[in-house]
Amino acid sequence: MIRFGIILLILSSFTISQQDGKNIPSPSWKDTSPSMLIGDFKDDYGIAYTLTDSLFTQHPNVKYHIIKWNLKDNYFIAKNDGANPSEQNLYSRIDFMEFSGMEPFRWGFCLTVYDAPTDSIAETKAVADRKDPKKGCGGFPFSRMKRK
């Protein structure tokens, strides 16, 4: 019983020190989300998006709750919102890449996996081909993004 109390005290101290007593998302999200991707965007089809360190929204009503950023391999894993029109509460892998010479489009994304039952399956099920952004998203182009 004493061990349980000590473990609880250590964990509660860690939680308080990690969040400074504020009700905010994990600092690691903000520290690992690339600033180039954060903000309001339109793709080359005119669809509007908003991306924060913890939420990717395809307006008006499709949301992906980001649970993991992988900057080394340029993707993030997200849980599909329960109110999405399809694939509710499943998991997605969204690959991204930076563009050069395609201004005003600075980056693009590929919804590589959108219907995995777990986050680990979404992460390992498929990978986008960034060598050919015009066909590297399962035979389709990456959606090119520009700031609104």
Predicted regions and their residues:
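Generic structural hydrophobic/aromatic packing signal, biased to beta-strands
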Residues: 51, 56, 94, 109-111, ...
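Hydrophobic/aromatic beta-strand elements that line small-molecule binding cavities or substrate pockets
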Residues: 63-69, 80, 91-100, 110-113
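Amphipathic/hydrophobic helical signal segments and adjacent flexible N-terminal regions
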Residues: 2-38, 100-148
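Extracellular low-complexity Ser/Thr/Asn/Gly-rich intrinsically disordered segments
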Residues: 59-61, 72-74, 119, 125
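Short beta-strand segments that buttress and anchor functional surface loops
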Residues: 76-84
